[in-house]
Amino acid sequence: MRMDKLTSRFQQALADAQSLAVGRDHNIIEPVHVLAALLDQSGGSTRPLLSQAGVNVPLLRERLGEALDTLPKVSGQEGNLSIGNDLNRLLNQTDKLAQQHGDAFIASEWFVLAAADDASPLGVALRAAGGDKKKIEAAIDKLRGGETVQSENAEEQRQALEKYTIDLTARAESGKLDPVIGRDEEIRRTIQVLQRRTKNNPVLIGEPGVGKTAIVEGLAQRIINGEVPEGLRGKRVLSLDMGALIAGAKFRGEFEERLKAVLSDLSKNEGQIILFIDELHTMVGAGKADGAMDAGNMLKPALARGELHCIGATTLDEYRKYIEKDAALERRFQKVFVGEPTVEDTIAILRGLKERYAVHHGVEITDPAIVAAATLSNRYITDRQLPDKAIDLMDEAASRIRMEIDSKPEELDRLERRLIQLKIQREMLKKEKDDASRQRLADLETDIDKLEREFYDLNELWKSEKAALQGTTKVKEQIEHAKLELEAAQRRQDYAKMSEIQYGVLPQLEKQMALANEVEHHDFKLVQDRVTAEEIAEVVSRWTGIPVNKMLEGERDKLLRMEDELHHRVVGQNEAIKVVSDAVRRSRAGLSDPNRPSGSFLFLGPTGVGKTELCKALADFLFDSTEAMIRIDMSEFMEKHSVARLIGAPPGYVGYEEGGYLTEAVRRRPYSLILLDEVEKAHPDVFNILLQVLDDGRLTDGQGRTVDFRNTVIVMTSNLGSHQIQELSGDDSAEAYTQMKAAVMGVVQAHFRPEFINRLDDIVVFHPLDKAQIKSIARIQLQGLEKRLAERGLKLDLDDAALEVLGSVGFDPVYGARPLKRAIQSQVENPLAQQILSGQYLSGDSVRVRADGGRLVFTKD
């Protein structure tokens, strides 16, 4: 017999049989070796063939093992391996059967058929396991589907649907799919398209996360439950696994061969299978090589002839990018648009899924948590779609509660660490012999005993609480399983089983659940098993950095005392601080307009009066870090072409992929303070971009993505009108301030357009600084120097007279507080640096700074 006339699978089986014989020290290859090798082949057709023919495969394996054990062993004869007479005879019979059926290559199933009525030990083992020649022959006919073997790889192309698709109807039947709530209109539209005579291939198009795949799963569930028109009853929905189809296709044409086998199997089923291709755009260009056809082109004839009943799913962008370009492929599909569900629909979807997630995590998900997940995700997570983002919120919040249940509570952990510390101290004190150490040891023993009792009580409490929670989890799982069995019995119309579950098993389990709930108190001290709205808000805060969780008492007090906190860093400017504080309080109390930024201000005033410093202080107050402020120097945007840098370059320009300077910063940190410094120096076109930010709290970047500015505070600073402020300064009365503000506003209105000024929440005019305020600023600025000296082990001591000197030297009504910084450098830092370097001051010394005749004198204390 020519080996090249065997299929590749059969050749591989003979090679494996030879290897098996060598491993068992057999010098003759027998038929049992070959069948054992065929059964062990991964992805082979022998096992499913025998199972279909009613053969008990585990028993057959057992009998084959016994037959192999009875074969004689010969050691030291590994090179003298030969084919036995029984195997030779069987192979000839196999060749004969293949020729009778018109096969060009000999397939492994004819070997199994030849063995069925053979007198060899293999035939005996096969018949003992239930092998019958007629049944095996019928199974072969079903497996081959009337086709002959015309290629070496023919066996590998069999059962293509089992290998390269996932049966969604089977998953729905076994209860592995999540329930699909709502989406009735889209499912009805999909069924409507599937029922058409031609072009009966719907393609579901929608944004990522709106539930396109869920619609197909919903269709599979409806088919299983018989809730579909007559034309779709009994059909199967198979999902094409593109990964399995491409994986391992090493040679050119292998991918096409697999896809052809899938299409061939589908045509054999004569419309009884609906193929679901998720991410349909991957078919365009898949398997494409030089001059080769891609998968999309291979699908076209089958779609046109109606042999392929297909549902596609893809996103809007990818449909436009890949499918619309191929008009011949596009016309064979009928578009079904899947929109984002409303918040109310999302709440209904979450209520349907709640039970599955609660059972998986072993926690209780409350209804307020579901409402919070839908509303908060819609309000704060703007770059993703409902219901996906709301489901993720619920899932992560439940996961967090589960993790807290499984891990040791913080209180218990702290006690354990304290005990370890005390025990280490006890071991050290045992080595000491003096009376004081013995006394300390006795005190320590008392403390350890007390802590150990406390730890034991808490540990027992934790274990009992945890056990109570686990009890309810098991009952919930049993209820879920019983409901799935009830649905399966309903489909089979097994009324006896339905009655048993509905009136026996389920009431019993619900009674157990009620008892478990009585034991389980929700006011547990250490563990909490309920997901509430607070947990959902906590997850949103972690995702976005926006503080949407319930305010703690400490934070409320801090917000009420906000003006005092800001005055620690900004001297004077009461009006500006009040305006900014009110805006932040409105936002945190949830009273500000949800479709506009939390606050938008224009700070006006001469240089050095604290405009930028107030922004830094505000960022520090809100985010505990001045780094959280997005600072953009508007003098960088003086030219017209530089405006695009704020939102990103348009398509076709260099830097398109990088995104915008402003938009990318806000996308990464949606809760932030944006400082547009020296705004009057920017090109007028910048203000056109800012109009929609100030009005609608949104901005579209160069890539077409909408960036949310609703949680930002926007502050613009400007020196416009500083000349008028200087002229009218000196009078602290309210009338003088009103007159000054009117003069400044005249300059502002002449420079900025009315539509820009009209969109701002407030325009604040900063007061020029007086001598007393400069002295207070000097005290604040010297705190930084004191901190730096403290790192070197030195202490700084300045009296009021020295501060007066610094204030008078650093006071300049035109330049504000900036000359003060230079005065501190020249009067304090420079002489002090020289004296430290010369060794006059060492670590631990105190530096006294005193005034003497208008100059500062340094002495060591």
Swiss-Prot record:
Region (C-terminal): 769-861
Ligand binding (ATP 2): 605-612
Coiled coil: 391-523
NBD2 as annotated region, ranges: 555-768
Residues where ATP 1 binds: 206-213
KW Acetylation (keyword) present: no
InterPro entries: AAA+_ATPase (IPR003593), ATPase_AAA_core (IPR003959), Chaperonin_ClpB (IPR017730), Clp_ATPase_C (IPR019489), Clp_N_dom_sf (IPR036628), Clp_R_dom (IPR004176), ClpA/B (IPR001270), ClpA/B_CS1 (IPR018368)
Family: Belongs to the ClpA/ClpB family.
Clp R domain residues: 3-146
Gene that this polypeptide is encoded by: clpB
Role of this protein: Part of a stress-induced multi-chaperone system, it is involved in the recovery of the cell from heat-induced damage, in cooperation with DnaK, DnaJ and GrpE. Acts before DnaK, in the processing of protein aggregates. Protein binding stimulates the ATPase activity; ATP hydrolysis unfolds the denatured protein aggregates, which probably helps expose new hydrophobic binding sites on the surface of ClpB-bound aggregates, contributing to the solubilization and refolding of denatured protein aggregates by DnaK.
Protein name, as recorded: Chaperone protein ClpB
Domain statement: The Clp repeat (R) domain probably functions as a substrate-discriminating domain, recruiting aggregated proteins to the ClpB hexamer and/or stabilizing bound proteins. The NBD2 domain is responsible for oligomerization, whereas the NBD1 domain stabilizes the hexamer probably in an ATP-dependent manner. The movement of the coiled-coil domain is essential for ClpB ability to rescue proteins from an aggregated state, probably by pulling apart large aggregated proteins, which are bound between the coiled-coils motifs of adjacent ClpB subunits in the functional hexamer.
Subunit details: Homohexamer. The oligomerization is ATP-dependent.
Entry's localization field: Cytoplasm
NBD1 as annotated region, ranges: 159-340
Gene Ontology molecular function, alphabetical: ATP binding; ATP hydrolysis activity
Record keywords: ATP-binding, Chaperone, Coiled coil, Cytoplasm, Nucleotide-binding, Repeat, Stress response
Region (Repeat 2): 83-146
Species this protein is from: Xanthomonas axonopodis pv. citri (strain 306)
Keyword ATP-binding appears in the UniProt entry: yes
CC per GO annotation: cytoplasm
SMART domains: AAA, ClpB_D2-small
Superkingdom: Bacteria
CDD domains referenced in this protein's UniProt entry, alphabetically: AAA (cd00009), RecA-like_ClpB_Hsp104-like (cd19499)
